[in-house]
């Protein structure tokens, strides 16, 4: 018969463990061995460092990104949210630890029959503790820790996005400056052409149509100059915002004039690893994962709310009718109590609360799976863009050189009276257009590499 209480104890513990098991679905991620469009890339482990943008070898870009990281307000907000989550963890834990309070009271009662005033003085410290028997503390702590990790990865995401935006804006700025330089150079050459045609016209060697055509070419190039000047100013203002600077402060810093965007361009070698790497590298995927962990903890708390709770309370102090006797031994009192509370009927509120928490968990599970698919798509898109742009750049480099030779030879033929001026116009337009397109392709290829680094998760662990 003595074994019966022991057996009942084992059964009770087993039921407690079973009742706390929340049985949640696991993510189903479709893994692939390699990227579909990554055949021309190294499949070694990803080795992008924390300062991944340094691979471009541009000191101005390095300085801009470092300044943005140090001053950008969104970075500061994200860092503050990490600290907020850390404080919330302490608050969460404290809710499941004993609480101690103290009370001091003075009472007076007047008896009208005897006309006496009875006084009482009390000092009663109290302690109470709701025992987390069914995992409520564990689930609450798990949820709070997941919130910290979520904010850490959110910080990583904000930082990576900032780094990529600064790099993209910088190469866009270089592109506009190159376009402006081409427009100015073309305008100068066309102005010289107008001077020549005007001279030939005055001596009867060129028609008025030729002169008007030469002027139209000049006006076309000159019309592009203010457009690129405007684009440069707008890009600089965008960079100022990313830097956390006022426009005036940022403009005083200055960004060196550079044509390195074409002169120093070369294909960059980036190891892309395997698709599963994005699961632990991408900030958005990891943030979605920890959101899922928070949801799981919320389900656990909702389940715990449906189970019995045990509260222990203790109070001890002094109660007396005379203030000078407050600290005498005769006035000391103590009380200890334990209570067990089991929710019985609340119109299904607790059960529906758990079911609602489970639905939120499923929503976040699907969001996590979707974030993985989107990460794969981002990498594949960047790989396609880089691969196709490589071939396009090679063709356009040859095309620009061909149009340059055509323009030189056509102009020489025209001066010798062996070609019509329309041929000169066509050659000039083709050269101008091909130069612009080539500069844009080079800038876009830099941005493609930026997008690939961002898609792979950038420099994890900052």
What is each stretch, according to the model?
Residues 191, 220-248, 302, 397-456:
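Short segments within alpha-helical structural elements
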Residues 40-67:
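Regulatory alphaC helix of protein kinase catalytic domains
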Residues 20-36, 66-132, 230, 236-251, ...:
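A small-residue-enriched
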Residues 45, 59, 88, 112, ...:
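Coil residues (strongly favoring Ser/Thr
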Residues 146, 153-274, 385, 412, ...:
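Periplasmic alpha-helical coiled-coil/stalk elements that build and connect Gram-negative outer-membrane
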Residues 1-8:
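Bacterial N-terminal signal peptides that target proteins for export
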Residues 76-77, 93-94, 131-159, 209, ...:
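Sec/SRP-type N-terminal targeting helices
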